[in-house]
């Protein structure tokens, strides 16, 4: 190869990302850019493409052995995409990613579905609170977080023989501002989901009280921002019986204190707040619970 093809890895990574910008969402592109800068450009960026060997690739992957399997797989995919693209453009005579194993990283923590008792306790604890509608939709329709936060009433069909939700939009956050898109995660994500009577009744009640076009909305009727959703979910975590940290001033100094609530006890400053949730629960776990119940139905 002549000097005309002398291209540094960092330069070609930037070009590859530019080529992807026409095909992927801005959020996906941001994720690619961050991962590429941290795990590909840092160790390999100053090298010329044709000078990179299989050993260089494997050495670059070593720090990822202690990271999650998901991150390992993502970096592996990006490396292969970049070098196979360079090979197709005839910038390489030899592709150093050939034979690179996709297996590596630490396996993710297993997500356990909630039991029927845990579901009942969770719903009883947050009934009447801001996260209740979100939790009901996730538990009884299996929608992803971004699908629930982007759900509008024109896709909720309650007055038909078999009530259902039609997934046609997705939410994402850009600079902590909600963006609603008709571009879904996959083709299969565009689907109609029958819903049970308990969710139908819940949604009917919510619909009667709201003027917003969004099923889950802020007080102004707008879709939630990322920070607003975190505050909504705080209603769940603050009712956990896990140790809670708080800070107080003692003799003019800020001191960190830890309290471990007993199940059923009340918060001193807010007697209405009951510490009742003695298990871990995340938004994704609600969807996992729905899918698990479908499998065993």
Q: Can you say where each PLM-predicted feature lies in the sequence?
A:
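Short, small-residue-biased leader/transition segments that mark boundaries at the very start
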Residues: 1-5
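Charged catalytic carboxylate motif
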Residues: 8, 12, 35, 56, ...
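N-terminal core-binding DNA-recognition domain of tyrosine site-specific recombinases/integrases
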Residues: 17-91, 96, 108-110, 222-228, ...
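Conserved hydrophobic/aromatic pocket- or pore-lining residues that grip, position, or stack substrates
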Residues: 40, 57, 79-82, 90, ...
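Short, basic (Lys/Arg/His-rich) helix/loop patches that form interaction surfaces
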Residues: 69, 120, 124-129, 141, ...
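Basic, Lys/Arg- and aromatic-enriched nucleic-acid-binding interface segment
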Residues: 69-77, 88-153, 159-162, 188-189, ...
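Basic, Lys/Arg-rich DNA-contacting stretches centered on the C-terminal catalytic core
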Residues: 104-106, 110, 125-126, 146, ...
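Short, polar N-cap/turn motifs at the start of nucleic acid-interacting alpha helices
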Residues: 155-164, 280, 297
């Amino acid at each position: 190869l002549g000097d005309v093809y002398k291209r540094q890895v960092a330069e070609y990574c930037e070009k590859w990302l530019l080529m992807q910008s026409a095909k992927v969402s801005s959020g996906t592109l941001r994720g690619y850019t961050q991962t590429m800068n941290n795990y590909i450009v840092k160790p390999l960026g100053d090298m010329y493409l044709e000078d990179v060997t299989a050993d260089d690739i494997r050495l670059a992957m070593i720090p990822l052995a202690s990271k999650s399997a998901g991150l390992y797989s993502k970096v592996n995919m990006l490396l292969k995409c970049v070098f196979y693209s360079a090979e197709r453009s005839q910038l390489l005579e030899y592709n150093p990613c050939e034979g690179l194993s996709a297996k590596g990283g630490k396996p993710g923590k297993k997500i356990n579905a909630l039991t029927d008792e845990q579901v009942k306790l969770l719903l009883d604890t947050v009934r009447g609170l801001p996260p209740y509608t979100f939790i009901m939709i996730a538990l009884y329709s299996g929608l992803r977080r971004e699908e629930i936060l982007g759900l509008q009433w024109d896709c909720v069909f309650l007055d038909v023989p078999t009530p259902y939700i039609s997934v046609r939009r997705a939410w994402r956050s850009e600079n902590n501002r909600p963006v609603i898109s008709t571009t879904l995660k996959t083709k299969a994500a565009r689907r109609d989901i029958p819903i049970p009577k308990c969710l139908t009744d819940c949604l009917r009640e919510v619909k009667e009280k709201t003027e917003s076009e969004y099923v889950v909305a802020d007080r102004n009727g707008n879709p939630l921002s990322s920070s607003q959703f975190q505050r909504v979910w705080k209603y769940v975590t603050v009712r956990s019986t896990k140790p809670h940290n708080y800070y107080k001033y003692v003799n003019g100094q800020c001191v960190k204190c830890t309290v471990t609530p007993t199940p059923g006890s009340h918060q001193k400053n807010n007697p209405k707040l009951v510490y009742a949730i003695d298990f871990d629960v995340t938004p994704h776990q609600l969807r996992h619970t729905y899918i698990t119940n479908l499998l065993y139905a």
